[in-house]
Amino acid sequence: NEDLFQYNTKVSVPFVISNKNYGILWDSYSYCRWGNPEDYLQLNRAFKLYDKDGKEGQLTGTYVDKNGQKIVRGEDSIYFEYAMPEASEICNKTDNGGIQNLPKGFALNGSKVVYEGYVEAPTNSFYQFILYYAGYMKIYIDGKLVVPERWRTAWNPNSYKFETPIKKGVKTPIRIEWQPDGDVSYCGLRVAAPRSEAEKNQLSIWSEMSPDMDYYFIAGQNLDEVISGYRTLTGKASLYPKWTLGFWQSRERYQSSKDIEDNMKKFRDLHIPVDNIVQDWNYWKLDSWGSHEFEAARYPNPQAMLDSVHAMNGRFMISVWPKFYDTVKNYKELDSKGWMYHQAIKDDIHDWLGFRGSFYDAYSDGARKMFWRQMDENLYTKYKFGIDAWWMDASEPNVRDCTPMWYRKALSGPTALGTSTEYFNAYSIVNADAIYNGQRSVNPNQRVFLLTRSGFAGEQRYSTATWSGDIATRWEDMRAQMTAGLNYSMAG
């Protein structure tokens, strides 16, 4: 079972490939579910719950802060998966869930939380759970450690699916151990309703909003022919520049042109092969996100920096977001045409640096052309085509972390094509279109290369590579990237 939506560390392409030499491309841009078309249930909707003393109705939640102060209360569900901006009128009117339902006044940082008791299942089954977590988590069911310790940073929680057998009519012990990460943290545990073997062996597809229920069946003699058919439908993959196959040097983050040049020279002095050095975010003035301008105090001569990198036989990639602070000139120019999303401004959302901004509407052809022109005037043509590649960060788009699905759609719409519900998953491809066709329009003899944090069917035609986002620094997350990368690469 899989939910198809875009988020930091999650890329969703509505294409499935079979070892029987066929593929199915689902023609929908919206949030989808593959496998089980029903959403996961809160624990009290799937099971009878009992507290740790055996009383029916709810689990026991025990919260102990770093000073040893304890709160014990009943929990009929474990669903603390999101936060809402305090100034948002629509949030305050329509959604009182998420971390607002944690104990009032309880300090999460340094605390330990345990949810425990018993679940009684309505039928014998292997139950599929989905865990949402930030901080350290362990789960025991029927006395067995079914989820060994996992960790995620609080600003970017993770989901983890697991399956375990539970017998009908038996009070089965459950224990969830959570050590939150930071002052604000998240956790949740839900479960899918059991399905028959026949249902499990069928492909069910659910789409939240599509004008038609269309899909393409792609047959072939082998998997290569299936991928070829997929590319016939969605676009041929562009040829990357040769240097992209070499080693890239990136970090969070180089903070000056001197940093860039010194590190590139050090690699050369040590005879360590490197083909590409990457400038991550915040090369602009602190309050000027979206200006696409190097801060002069730290980057006094960007052209000389680029020339130096090229003289050392290196390439230069730079991060550009579809995000703009509402005080910068580029925001105002886009906004004057109606090409900025306004909900984040209306709700007075400030980012982690303390400034307010939003994302542009890449579904508008005019907005895409203006977005590229702003990049070109401030970065590309301005520096004699010296930028070799573009890192398109947050291209889901991820306007704000850790919000519920309905509010994410409110933040990223309405689009020029229609409601963000219908076009929820396709932002990265139209954003890639802006840069690919923009660069080709001013410099058709140079190959384009884009690194993007999100992807969709057809992304390959814009010479994109996709990375899996801000994963955790844990071995289990590193291992997951291997299968995730193989899985993603099967989509053309």
Language-model features: where?
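Aromatic-lined ligand-binding clefts that engage carbohydrates, nucleic acids, or primary amines
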Residues: V119-I139, I174
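Catalytic-domain carbohydrate-binding cleft regions of carbohydrate-active enzymes
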Residues: N1-T60, D65-T94, G98-Y115, Y136, ...
